[in-house]
């Protein structure tokens, strides 16, 4: 019984540690979602939760999300340069 409990706890911890995170990106332009109020930011929290991420905040003037769904892209996108040639 104790072994089963330990295995379950390890699997939960493993999923938490390896969750995807990164900057929220506009897939059309390739640009990060811009924010101005650094730290906890309602705009970033709402935008990150809308795509299924667990939490979001403003970091480096971009919305940074934790707990991204694996099927959602993060910034930078491979073939998008956000307006740069």
Swiss-Prot record:
SMART domains: Knot1. One of its GO terms (molecular function) is sodium channel inhibitor activity. Has the structural arrangement of an alpha-helix connected to antiparallel beta-sheets by disulfide bonds (CS-alpha/beta). It comes from the Eukaryota. Beta toxins bind voltage-independently at site-4 of sodium channels (Nav) and shift the voltage of activation toward more negative potentials thereby affecting sodium channel activation and promoting spontaneous and repetitive firing. InterPro entries: LCN-type_CS_alpha_beta_dom, Scorpion_toxin-like, Scorpion_toxin-like_sf, Scorpion_toxinL, Scorpion_toxinL/defensin. Disulfide bonds join 31-82, 35-58, 44-63, 48-65. Its main location: secreted. It is found in: Secreted. One of its GO terms (biological process) is defense response. Expressed by the venom gland. This is Toxin Cll7. Residues 1-19 form the signal peptide. Belongs to the long (4 C-C) scorpion toxin superfamily. Sodium channel inhibitor family. Beta subfamily. The keyword Secreted applies.
